[in-house]
A protein has these predicted regions:
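Short beta-strand->loop
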Residues: 16
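Residue-level "micro-hotspots" composed of small/polar
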Residues: 5, 19-31, 43-45, 50, ...
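Catalytic-site microenvironment of enzymes
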Residues: 54
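Sequence-structural signature of mature extracellular/luminal beta-sheet repeat domains
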Residues: 1-8, 29, 35-38
Length: 170
């Protein structure tokens, strides 16, 4: 579960019940994001996002595209993307798009076992994650995924059911 201490009321509340789900597994890591929301890496309930200001919560699991519901660590980069590790590698979530993307191929990660709650954001924007093979450090801004070039698409021909379709010249 998750404990919350209300300073004004001087009360401690232990929570396992969230909006639409109940935590059944321990929390491995907590991270307070720059927007004041809390990210919880659980041992089998996926990645949980809680907004303490509104008490709204959401959960990312294998049903949303995760490769595992066992999240090992979680951290945020300087662009607000949430990075987390599972038994299957390193991933990030773009909070605006709610899209989960694997960083394994981009970083050449193979067979690394990530350590619980072992993530760090360096002042220069680099992220580090502790693994069984040492420390993995990289700068998310330098990944090819984020350095997209606008490409103009030109179609010479388009076929629909083996029939060529011509575009209006304008």
């Amino acid at each position: 579960g998750f404990g919350i201490f209300d300073k004004k009321a001087k009360k401690f509340e232990w929570r396992r019940e969230f909006e639409g789900f109940t935590l059944k597994y321990p929390i491995r890591a907590l991270f307070c994001a720059s927007d004041g929301t809390i990210w919880m890496a659980t041992d089998g309930d996926g990645l949980v996002h809680l907004d303490p200001a509104t008490d709204r919560s959401e959960r990312y699991t294998t049903e949303n595209g995760l490769t595992s519901d066992a999240i090992i660590s979680v951290h945020e980069d300087i662009e607000g993307r949430i990075w987390f590790t599972t038994e299957e590698g390193l991933f990030w979530l773009d909070p605006e798009r709610r899209t989960i993307i694997s960083a394994n191929d981009l970083l050449g990660i193979e067979g690394s076992i990530f350590n619980p709650n072992a993530a760090w954001l360096h002042p220069d924007g680099h992220l580090s994650f502790g693994t069984s093979q040492g420390i993995l450090t990289f700068n998310p801004a330098e990944l090819d995924y984020f350095n997209k070039v606008d490409i103009k698409l030109i179609l010479n021909d388009l076929s629909l059911n083996y029939n060529s379709i011509t575009a209006d010249p304008e």
